[in-house]
Amino acid sequence: GGDYWLKVRAESGGETVVDSVFVHVLGEQVLAPVPEGLVDGINYIDETTVQLVLYAPMKENVFVIGDFNNWVPYTDYRMAKDGDRWWFTLTDLVPGKEYGFQYQVDSDVIIADPYTEKTLDPKDRGIPEATYPNLKPYPEGLTSGITAVLQTGQENYDWVNASFDAPPQEELVIYELLVRDFIAAHDYKTLTDTLNYF
């Protein structure tokens, strides 16, 4: 197996056209059990390592693509298979740095991790800095669709209300609200100022 770039250059009448295509020749699929204790999604192992697990039944190949490999499905990023689950270990990550990534499934389907806590969308460029400061830019021209984001070395959230006591789950009333569609400012600060029970 291996990774290859096929490059073509054509010249005619003083004009030159160049094109290329990425091809990988696959070796044997690595079959290995998902390491003990891992759950589907992003598993943070330490400051520089994550293990990714994806449930994808009846698939033949799954690759991890992202900022760490310039969004190219190199054979070194082919996930190991364990029945209907696929897994991969990413190492040498920079603590605290956000990495966008996706799964390339059977060469023609590209998806974000379904369990990710943060995504990037091509439409994100319309989000004002005041609404989301320092939003990681979408990888324009490198991929398409929604991407997942992982980040090792995240700081734990400091809870400011130490006296909060959550009610029993059976007494909760939960509803979903898409802030983007609910208020023009698209931010949580305006939402909490608008709804008087926060």
Where are the model-predicted features located?
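Extracellular ectodomain segments of secreted/surface proteins
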Residues: 26-53
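Aromatic-rich carbohydrate-binding modules that target alpha-glucans
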Residues: 46, 53-98, 106-132
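C-terminal edge beta-strand
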Residues: 17-28
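Aromatic- and glycine-enriched glycan-recognition loops and surfaces
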Residues: 82-96, 180-198
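Core domains of carbohydrate- and sulfate-ester-processing enzymes
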Residues: 109-161
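Exposed beta-strand face motif in extracellular beta-rich ectodomains
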Residues: 2-6, 97-99
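Coil residues (strongly favoring Ser/Thr
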Residues: 19-20, 47, 155, 194
